[in-house]
């Protein structure tokens, strides 16, 4: 299961929505890295479908030499040179809860003597050690991620990101563990903490998505801003790992289409169709759920199942 979006001492106030129908991306050309062989990616992700959405991609040859890290129904890490796999890791663990936030950490250090220590993948603080495909990099391999070329967030060889992204760190020159970014709270739930690990390195960045007018703004202090494409101010949303909002479930719907980060459902004309969501209602207080019809359907039913 994913993280429950519980409030913690460290609050994340917003995320960036990547609504796949808008073709959103963030782009940036990296500089000469601090260390091309050593880096860490950390991101909180809430996916909207089963496809592999790109969290970080390098691709300058149209899919012949490329690398990316994706999350969909599983986590994949690929690095290909001239069509041959240098890294190919695909988790056997599946991540099907589209109502939950997942914390993904990928730590790379290809100088390690043991191959399984050269790439470590974690989800919600747990290291993933079972892979359907497991090709680890050779020792001292210079990967294509973190090289001095154009990089993408939200689009890639294996699919576009359809979901929400929050608290996205990239640290150039350090292989870190999830303990730098999260902890288990008293209820046994993995929650975020503030990163205090020091320098981000030559290519590092911290995307907190705090500025709705500039969603690619790097708030690490390094000034490594990204260019936002097809992302509007409205794509800064309050759905976050510490304030999880309900969305419609792509695994429990009719033949209609979900969009807008699984907040909108378009039915099929002339047919009954439906979509469901999971809503966690607190034990006390007064709470409201609003559903709005954006079309001229004559019969719309809204109900609760307990």
Language-model features and meaning:
Residues 1-37, 74, 81-86, 147-149, ...:
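Low-complexity, glycine/proline/serine-rich flexible segments
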Residues 1-20, 42-50, 68-139:
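Extracellular glycan-interaction surfaces
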Residues 21-76, 113-115, 176-179, 281-283, ...:
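Extracellular glycan-recognition modules
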């Amino acid at each position: 299961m994913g993280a429950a979006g519980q409030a913690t001492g460290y609050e994340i106030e917003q995320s960036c929505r990547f609504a796949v129908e808008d073709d959103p991306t963030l782009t940036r050309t990296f500089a000469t890295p601090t260390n091309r062989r050593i880096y860490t990616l950390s991101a909180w992700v809430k996916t909207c479908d089963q496809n592999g959405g790109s969290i970080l991609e390098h691709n300058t040859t149209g899919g012949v030499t490329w690398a990316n890290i994706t999350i969909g129904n599983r986590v994949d890490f690929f690095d290909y040179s001239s069509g041959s796999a240098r890294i190919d890791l695909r988790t056997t663990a599946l991540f099907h809860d589209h109502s939950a936030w997942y914390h993904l950490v990928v730590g790379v250090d290809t100088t390690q003597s043991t191959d399984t220590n050269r790439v470590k993948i974690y989800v919600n603080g747990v290291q993933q050690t079972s892979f359907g495909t497991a090709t680890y990099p050779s020792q001292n391999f210079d990967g294509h991620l973190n090289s001095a070329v154009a990089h993408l967030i939200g689009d890639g060889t294996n699919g576009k990101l359809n979901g929400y992204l929050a608290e996205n760190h990239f640290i150039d020159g350090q292989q870190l563990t999830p303990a730098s970014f999260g902890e288990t709270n008293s209820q046994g739930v993995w929650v975020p903490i503030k990163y205090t690990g020091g320098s981000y390195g030559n290519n590092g960045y911290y995307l907190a998505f705090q500025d709705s007018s500039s969603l690619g703004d790097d708030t690490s202090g390094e000034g490594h801003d990204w260019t936002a494409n097809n992302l509007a101010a409205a794509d800064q949303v309050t759905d976050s790992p510490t304030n999880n909002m309900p969305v419609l479930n792509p695994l429990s719907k009719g033949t209609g289409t979900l969009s807008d980060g699984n907040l909108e459902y378009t039915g099929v004309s002339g047919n009954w169709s439906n979509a469901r969501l999971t809503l966690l209602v607190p034990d006390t207080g007064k709470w409201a759920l609003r559903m709005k019809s954006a079309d001229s359907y004559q019969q719309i039913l809204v109900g609760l199942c307990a």
